[in-house]
């Protein structure tokens, strides 16, 4: 049987869906539970869980530290997650993937520009409507209109440019390391999932990951 390897994104440990699936209320509890299952799977079944170093590793440790996780949990992260830097100079990626990525990025930039233009038109129109009836104070009009428009713009712009694509070095490192090791990608990130599929990589949703490992362990215990 081929050795099972998993490559973890930060969301594999920190995502809110993971906490819900485990029935816990905070990251400290969910991180400790997941790390205990990973440890058992490593010792009993030789299943290895990898994390890109230092991009994703630093991101994960920083997040857990800010959330007040116990030092013991951070020690488990260091002990049971295999830290490795992807061999970025040797991993071969088909040129078609780069073509698709650039095309996707260009479409997103154009969409973001259209959203920006619409936001400016909406701001001007609302400012005119609000100021006309009773000649409101100029600053009040600007504050009222801009706060509303900017908040709406941020949401739309973020979704247009970042939703469903790779938008950070850690995201890319997860895919590169998974390809190098022939490992399954574990994440709760639409962009990582989309590009994992395009690269022909196995993908496991973060909320399902602990239960998959537990299923392996339960079956082993029945032997």
Swiss-Prot record:
Keyword Nuclease: yes
EC class: hydrolase
Recorded catalytic activity of this chain's protein: Endonucleolytic cleavage of RNA, removing 5'-extranucleotides from tRNA precursor
GO biological process: tRNA 5'-leader removal
Pfam families with a match to the protein in the record: PIN_5 (PF08745)
GO MF annotation terms: ribonuclease P activity
UniProt keyword terms in alphabetical order: Endonuclease, Hydrolase, Nuclease, tRNA processing
Keyword tRNA processing part of the UniProt annotation: yes
NCBIfam families: PRK04358.1-1, PRK04358.1-4, RNA_lig_partner
Protein name: RNA-free ribonuclease P
């Amino acid at each position: 049987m081929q050795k099972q390897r998993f490559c973890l994104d930060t969301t594999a440990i920190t995502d809110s869906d993971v906490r819900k699936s485990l029935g816990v209320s905070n990251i400290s509890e969910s991180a400790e539970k997941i790390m205990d299952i990973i440890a058992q799977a490593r010792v009993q079944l030789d299943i290895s869980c990898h994390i890109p170093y230092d991009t994703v590793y630093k991101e994960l440790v920083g997040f857990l530290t800010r959330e007040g996780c116990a030092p013991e949990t951070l020690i488990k992260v260091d002990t049971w997650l295999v830290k490795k830097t992807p061999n970025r100079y040797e991993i071969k990626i088909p040129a078609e993937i780069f073509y698709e990525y650039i095309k996707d990025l260009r479409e997103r930039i154009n969409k973001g520009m259209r959203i920006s233009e619409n936001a400016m038109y909406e701001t001007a129109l609302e400012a005119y409507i609000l100021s006309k009836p009773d000649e409101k104070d100029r600053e009040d009009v600007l504050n009222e209109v801009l706060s509303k428009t900017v908040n709406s713009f941020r949401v739309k712009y973020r979704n247009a440019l970042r939703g469903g694509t790779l938008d950070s070095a850690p995201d890319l490192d997860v895919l590169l390391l998974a390809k190098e090791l022939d490992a399954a990608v574990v994440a709760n990130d639409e962009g990582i999932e989309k590009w994992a599929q395009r690269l022909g990589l196995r993908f496991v949703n973060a909320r399902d990951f602990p239960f998959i490992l537990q299923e392996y362990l339960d079956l082993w215990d029945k032997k």
